[in-house]
Amino acid sequence: MARGSLSLPALRGGLLALLAAALFGISTPLVQRLGAGLGAFTTAALLYAGAAVVGALSLRTAAHEARLQRSDAWRLIGMAGFGAALGPVALSWGLQHTSGASASLMLTLEALFTATLAWWLYSETMDRRVWAAMLLLLAGGMALVMDQGLQGGTQLLGLLAVLLATVAWGVDNTLSRGLAERDPSQVVMAKASLGAAATACLAMAWGEPLPTLTAALGLFAVGATGYGLSLRFYLLAQRAFGAARTGSVFAFAPFIGAAVAFGFGERSAGWLMLLGGLLMLAGVLLHLAESHGHEHAHDPL
């Protein structure tokens, strides 16, 4: 029913999804600035240490929140490995070697990998509009790669590292489906703690330099909001708004990040970057329209 899609829980879910997108989108250019000169493992460890504290502070023991079970352990380890270790490490390294706006826009491909994995592993239906949206996202990503390729090898490698981060987070999103009904605070704390511990150990083993107090506190705060609160809001939004629509709204995060990067003074955008951004925006809008129509048509009476 049309009325069902405008219910208060759905509206709340939509707002939570938008807030999650804004927090994560803003975090990307901030990580680029605060992480300048730091090792990628150190940056990732500080980000997820902040996220872990948010999870710990918001822990609930309410009866309506399903607690994590032993059977969730391997799924959590996978989420931490891909989403809280490989993803942020690849992003942190990439941000130091490529354009902040390009990196933000490239993160749009997370939606492509998430949707493709859902189709492959869970047999989710993907009609022609969804495939068209995915092709637009892919074409936009190719335009960004070409743009950074023209800037030089280092810029291209940085963007490819960001692409690796989107693959890692696509796997993370796929694994998180099985924990959507668990206490989101527990999920955030467990995933972030595992990721922070792993990347901190790697930072020490790699001999990365210690950050300044300002950089450490800044990255900790960005991790608390852009990764901890963002993930919590994302999981809560999935319950009321549906996984497909939540993912589609969250796909606007890269555009928020690109806008903030331009606000910080980045002016490296060429016509290929603008073309890539427009193609990706068209893909996200098409995917959002399809997701809304699909879930709308199947609303229970």
Q: Over which residues does each language-model region extend?
A:
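Cytoplasmic-side transmembrane-helix entry/capping segments in multi-pass membrane proteins
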Residues: A17-L18, S71-A80, M126-L138, G158-L159, ...
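Specific transmembrane alpha-helical segments of multi-pass solute transporters/efflux pumps
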Residues: L23-T28, A56-S102, L107, A115, ...
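Hydrophobic/aromatic residues within transmembrane alpha-helices
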Residues: L34, T43, L47, G94, ...
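Hydrophobic transmembrane alpha-helices of multi-pass small-molecule transport proteins
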Residues: G55, I77, L117, R129-Q148, ...
